[in-house]
């Protein structure tokens, strides 16, 4: 697999926006970027795989859950430059709303933990800036009855 750091081309990834009991499921990442920070579960689209198939596969791999893929909420771009000015990471991330349809919630090999967060909990977390901004933009959809 092509190295994720200092890539030749942008990488396409998916994010899974999964609400369970009115709480947002986040994964604590093991690998950069955002290592040891809470963010949406997800990962890269594999060659020959549709985006929605990638969402289903990543959900199962990272959370142990089978899901129904809902609507595309947003396309997020992450372009991170190294100190020398060259591109360290370049991701195009497609974040999909999803609902759990089966399985047992269990952290996969790419994550160190999974946890459900309500709106108040999220305000106390150190989140990657793109994750925090995404949640803020979609707070009314994700937490319609919470105090914002």
Residue ranges of model-derived segments:
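Conserved N-terminal beta-strand and adjoining loop/helix that marks the start
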Residues: 1-24, 97-99
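A generic structural micro-feature
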Residues: 6-10, 37, 85-92, 111
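N-terminal first-folded block
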Residues: 12, 17-54
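Short loop segments at secondary-structure junctions
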Residues: 20-23, 30, 99-104, 119-121
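The catalytic Nudix box helix
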Residues: 40-73, 96
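Active-site-adjacent beta-strand/loop module that shapes the phosphate/pyrophosphate-binding cleft
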Residues: 77-104
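NUDIX/MutT-family hydrolases
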Residues: 95-97, 106-137
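Acidic/histidine-enriched, glycine/proline-rich intrinsically disordered or flexible terminal extensions
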Residues: 141-148
């Amino acid at each position: 697999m092509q190295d994720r750091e200092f890539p030749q081309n942008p990488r396409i990834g998916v994010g899974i926006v999964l609400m369970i009991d009115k709480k947002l499921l986040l994964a604590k990442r093991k690998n950069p970027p955002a290592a040891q920070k809470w963010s949406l579960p997800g990962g890269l689209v594999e060659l020959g795989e549709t985006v929605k198939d990638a969402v289903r596969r990543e959900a199962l791999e990272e959370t142990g859950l089978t899901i129904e893929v809902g609507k595309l909420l947003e396309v997020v771009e992450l372009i991170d430059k190294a100190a020398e000015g060259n591109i360290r990471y370049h991701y195009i991330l497609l974040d999909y709303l999803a609902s759990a349809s089966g399985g047992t919630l269990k952290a996969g090999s790419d994550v160190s933990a999974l946890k459900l967060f309500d709106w108040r909990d999220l305000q106390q977390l150190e989140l990657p800036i793109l994750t925090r901004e995404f949640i803020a933009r979609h707070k009314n959809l994700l937490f319609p009855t919470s105090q914002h």
